[in-house]
Structures are given as C-alpha cells and as structure tokens.
Design a protein with these regions (language model features):
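A structural microfeature
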Residues: 45-47, 143-144, 187, 260
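Short amphipathic alpha-helix that is part of the acyltransferase structural core
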Residues: 1-25, 138-186
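A conserved beta-strand-loop-helix scaffold within acyl/acetyltransferase catalytic domains
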Residues: 12-36, 48-66, 173-175, 180-181, ...
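A short, internal acetyl-CoA/4′-phosphopantetheine-binding micro-motif in the GNAT/acyltransferase core
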Residues: 67-69, 73-86, 205-213
Length: 268
C-alpha cells in the first residue's frame, strides 16, 4: 500500500519518506509530547481509493487542554483519483456507518495528521474532488489554514544580534527555543524535527508584543533558519490560520512561500 499511498498524495506536506517511516507514521503515530494519537485506527483501500479512520486517544476540553477522557471519531485520510469517486464513496459510506450514532465526525483533523507530514492533518485545496465528496455527505469546513514552505540554504545569514537557547528534544521529536537579545528572552517557538532527518516544521513562534514591529521578529527567524541549516535541515515548513494576516505577512517577509489553502471538516 506504500506505493499506492505515494501515488495518491502530492500536497506540499506529503514529503518524501521511505516505507518504514511511512508505516510508523500511519499506524503508531505520536504527538509532540510522545502521546499516541489514536486508540484504534484502520486503513482500507480498493486499489484505487483509500481511507484511514479511527478514534483519537485524547481530545481537547473547553479550555483547550488535552483530556484523555475525550475521543473524537476521525477520518484521518481519504484519497482517490477523480475517476474513482464511486469506489471512494463506498469506502466513505462504510466509515460513516462505523461511526453511526456519533453526533459529530471529523475529517482531516489538523492535530492528528501524520508526523512524517509535519502532522499537518488538513486537506489541501488541490484535492477539491475529495472535499466535494465530503460535502456531498454532509461535511462542512471547520478551519482554513495557509500552508508555507521554505528551502533553507547556506546563504541564509544573520546579523548576530539574536541568539537561540534550545531546550531538550521531546519524546515526539520537538524542541522549544527561546530567542535572546542582550540577556533577555524576546521570543519563543517550537520546531518539530521530522523522521526523514532533513525536514523540520515550525509548530509555533511568538515574539514579545513590546518587541514586535522592530525588525527583531525577522532577526529571530533568520537566526532560526541559519541554525536549522547547520543542523542539517533543508526544508522548513509551517502554517497559519487563513484569518491571521499578520502571521502571513511575517512568514512571507522572512522567505516562506505560500503553498495554498488547507481545510479541516466536520459533519453537521
């Protein structure tokens, strides 16, 4: 199924990976802190269409905190060539029957994407035929993000004003950092180091509000990109909400390329 999966997945976050990395990420994935993502997960295919679905191992309470008492029914992946919609629809109907009785079913839940794909769980706008099939069965858009990608090069330079202090790597291969200027922390972030070895994903970044619009945010990103390059990273991606135009401007100013819109869905 590995070769079949590669044929059907060509979004910017479907990075090259060998079969062992793919298998681990498909079946035994964890989040940034090493928590298993799913209590149960099944994958089915017809030879022309595939679906992966199951129950999450945890969810998020009303305060946004992780709760092991909450379990979401999730269609993690649905993929097919446009000519095989009938086969894909049969798979989708089977999944909907499996989740029958659930008040809400999620599809392409961002947090529960594959680690080998930066855990970007949303569906790319290029796969409009998949979105149309979901919509045909009562799914609506939950959230929209802009996806960004950046190639790191040895020509990425910094003026040396900002230094980064890295924390230990988590069980989920993430490292947080603090950006320091004149002995004071002025920014923070978290980077996910993907199992491929030369790809990293920026999970989040924040610059002290009193330091914004001073050029220091750009200096922090330049320092980050330079250090990641020297760690062996060549591809550095991230995303932000479609509504967050300030973050979009920041990423585009610091060399990231807009690679399209991605969406998550839920059933009404």
């Amino acid at each position: 199924m590995y070769e079949f999966w590669k044929e059907l997945h060509n979004a910017p976050y479907h990075f090259p990976m060998d079969e062992s990395i793919w298998y681990e990420s498909m079946n035994y994935d964890v989040d940034s802190d090493g928590r298993e993502l799913f209590t149960e997960i099944d994958t089915e295919d017809t030879g022309h269409a595939m679906v992966q679905y199951g129950y999450s191992a945890f969810g998020f309470d009303e305060n946004g905190e992780i709760s092991p008492e909450i379990h979401y029914p999730i269609i993690r992946d649905l993929a097919f060539a446009p000519a095989y919609r009938t086969e894909a629809e049969a798979l989708l109907k089977k999944v909907l029957e499996y989740f029958k009785g659930e008040p809400r079913i999620y599809a392409f839940f961002h947090y529960f994407g594959m680690s080998a794909c930066g855990r970007h769980g949303k569906l790319h706008d290029n796969d409009r035929h998949i979105a149309q099939l979901l919509e045909r069965h009562g799914f609506v858009v939950e959230h929209e993000n802009v996806y960004y990608m950046r190639q790191l090069k040895d020509t990425d330079t910094t003026d040396g004003r900002v230094t980064l202090q890295w924390r230990e790597r988590t069980a989920g291969d993430c490292r947080e950092f603090a950006a320091v200027l004149d002995g004071l922390e002025i920014g923070w972030g978290q980077v996910h180091f993907l199992p491929q070895g030369d790809i990293a994903y920026l999970r989040w970044i924040f610059i002290d509000s009193q330091r914004q619009h001073s050029g220091l945010g750009t200096a922090v990103m330049k320092q980050l990109c330079q250090e990641l390059y020297h760690m062996g990273i060549r591809r550095f991606d991230t995303d932000t909400a479609l509504s967050n135009t300030a973050a979009q401007g920041y990423y585009e100013k610091t060399g990231f390329v807009n690679a399209g819109i991605t969406r998550s869905y839920y059933s009404k």
